[in-house]
Amino acid sequence: MHKYRTHTCGELSLAHVGLQVKLSGWLYRRRDHGGLLFIDLRDHYGIIQLVFNDDCSAVQAEISKIKFETVITVEGAVVARSNETINKNISTGDVEVVVSSYVVESFAEELPLQINGEYEAPEETRLKYRFLDLRGARLHQNIVLRSKVIQELRNQMLSNGFIEFQTPILTASSPEGARDFLVPSRLHPGKFYALPQAPQQFKQLIMMSGFDKYFQIAPCFRDEDARADRSPGEFYQLDIEMAFVTQEDVFGLVEPVLYNTFKKFSNYSITNIPFPRITYDESMLRYGSDKPDLRNPIQISDVTDIFQCSEFTTLKDSINCGAVVRAIPAPMSANKPRSFFDKMIEYAKHLGASGLAYIQFTNDGVKGSIAKFFDEALLARIKKLVKCQDGDAIFFICDKENDATKVAAKIRAKVGEELNIIKTDCYKFCWVIDFPFYQLDSEINKITFSHNPFSMPQGGIEAFNKAKTVEDLLSIKAFQYDIVCNGVELSSGAIRNHKPDLMYKAFAIVGYSKDEVDKQFGAMIRAFCYGAPPHGGIAPGIDRILMLLTNSVNIREVIAFPMNQQAEDLLMGCPAAVTDKQLHELQLKLISKERIK
């Protein structure tokens, strides 16, 4: 018989009744039923109930004193449970093991957190003792699912003829939207490597090396603040690049990969292929966001022109000063009590809005705080444009376009939540396309890239040459796209710029000289000069896919050893100070914050 086990704790069934077995695992739960002592033994595969009979009173006394999570090995006979004691909640619930002997393999100290799920410890404790936290069923299953999802993604890519690559982790710094993690070079004092924010340049170079289809389960490193859906430090993505493809070719690959993965690991309904395509401008108008949550059926409308024709003097004055008016419908809420509308007004003020107007289309006529300013013809226009019917209400926000867009998005979400019309058992996918190539950084009043600087502008170099004003530049669209699910951006992607003259021009507009471009992107620019194929790609985030599949509230629930929101690894105690010897080898010296100032 094997030293530790003949079976796992999750595989025993009625087919094993009568067998002598050996099991090893963690002492999970204990119940003393007066003469009979029951122990739940847990391993990676499941839970089995152990029985210590009353003819082993000395053994019962010993095992009763052992702390939870002690590792033990037991021998015993598999027996069927009586009908009234069958446990349908576990896979081994039809049987139990009557123990004849046991050995303690490793004692556990008093636990800093409970494993059995009776209450959840503070996150700081969970992260500090992550090896204990990972024993809990939910987190343990999430990590197992992570492995299965990655395997599924890999299998689908291989079946589509892709080649898996591994690109360098130590590379050069490049401006990709976030701060780099820098690694000092011992052999080249004063110089630094950077951990890759993404394998962007390498995967494009792979296309220029004559390969046709690239993928990688890629680690990415970005020194940025944490969010619920973003881990500080590192994350993983399914990095994809293809040669000789159009935007629709990329969509045609990615849609079945995501659809099949979500179908395999969830019983929720999923958007049918092809996924809807929504332009960036339409998304910002209809949903107030470039990450639309299509589970919420409410769509925002622009009613500025109609309000311009009304008798609402105050808002007309605001419109004349550059404001816009957005309408947010509230289906079947016209007869809601006044408290509903007051609550929404207070919420809008909390968001920074000066107020929130509304109209109610009741069966008894039109009511609401601003109904008196509109004649029947204008009300009919509003109703038609916003696609409302009797029984609906409409909220209105008036402000500068950016502010109105942000507030309208929040009001849309709040109305959907209050009316309980946001579906929770589905995955709603869409593509957001035609992103602006450039954006205006209002803080420094300067043109910057809106997304990936390596994307292809629609219209090519002619679009740059025709642009005479800042507004012209901001109107240039890129072959850039995002895949969004339930309001979560799973990935950005683009058809790449593969022409040197176009690359220099694109960077010159944001202030880069030719020498600076050559210095930062020399390898890629050189490759462009030796026959670069048209190419494009995308990189769905694996952590975010898992967040959606597990209904996790934050990304740390799908990562085995995550950092906290302050970018600290509480388990390993990092970031940490290093020795003077290490600094000397790197020819580095620490200076105080006061001296930096």
Swiss-Prot record:
Cystine residue pairs: none
GO cellular component: cytoplasm
Residues given in the record as ATP binding sites: R222, D223, E224, E489, G541, I542, D543, R544
Residues with site note (Important for tRNA non-discrimination): H33
Catalytic reaction(s) noted: tRNA(Asx) + L-aspartate + ATP = L-aspartyl-tRNA(Asx) + AMP + diphosphate
EC number: 6.1.1.23
Cited NCBIfam families: aspS_bact, PRK00476.1
Quaternary structure and interacting proteins, as annotated: Homodimer.
Protein family according to the UniProt entry: Belongs to the class-II aminoacyl-tRNA synthetase family. Type 1 subfamily.
Name of the protein this chain belongs to: Aspartate--tRNA(Asp/Asn) ligase
Record organism: Orientia tsutsugamushi (strain Boryong)
